[in-house]
Curated annotation (Swiss-Prot):
One of its GO terms (cellular component) is cytoplasm. The gene is rlmH. This is Ribosomal RNA large subunit methyltransferase H. GO terms for molecular function: rRNA (pseudouridine-N3-)-methyltransferase activity. It comes from the Bacteria. PANTHER family: METHYLTRANSFERASE (PTHR33603), RIBOSOMAL RNA LARGE SUBUNIT METHYLTRANSFERASE H (PTHR33603:SF1). Pfam families: SPOUT_MTase.
Length: 153
């Protein structure tokens, strides 16, 4: 099984990328993990065209058999333990999973329509780059929960 986080944009500030990279490295001990970034539609920012362009880029990165899970503010809110259980179910199915994170304008309707699941990382509205860090950390935490390791206390 492989889990991929497919996200719009890069961390140009350098604030989050080191932590995301560290958790991605740690995840590699448990499963195949990949972070895929697609470009932001900067010229169209704030317009309906931005969502469409970014959505098309996200969809183009998906494999035909990947389970698609989107991060969405209206998605299921899970505890870390419940998220670990969700990851366990994905692993039991043996299906690759793509977790999609939209840009600052959100996700295009076409992307939401392709989603098999929707997850919320918080009730707070988070910068999408911060949401990426939270998601990757929670994936790592889920793996340690499933293995009974002491990271999650």
């Amino acid at each position: 099984m492989k889990i991929r986080v497919v996200a719009v944009g890069r961390d140009r500030s350098g604030l989050y990328a080191p932590a995301v990279d560290e958790y991605a490295k740690r995840l590699g001990r448990y499963l195949r993990f990949e972070l895929v970034e697609v470009p932001e539609a900067r010229k169209l920012a704030g317009t309906p065209g931005a969502k469409g362009e970014e959505g098309a880029a996200l969809l183009a990165k998906l494999g035909p058999r990947e389970r698609v899970v989107v991060l969405d503010e209206r998605g299921d809110e899970l505890t870390s333990v419940a998220f670990a259980e969700r990851v366990r179910r994905w692993m039991e199915r043996g299906q690759d999973v793509a977790l999609l994170i939209g840009g600052s304008d959100g996700l295009a309707p076409e992307v939401l329509a392709r989603a098999e699941e929707r997850l919320a990382v918080s009730r707070f509205t988070l910068a999408h780059r911060l949401a990426r860090l939270v998601l990757v950390e929670q994936l790592y935490r889920a793996m340690t929960i499933l293995r009974g390791e002491p990271y999650h206390k």
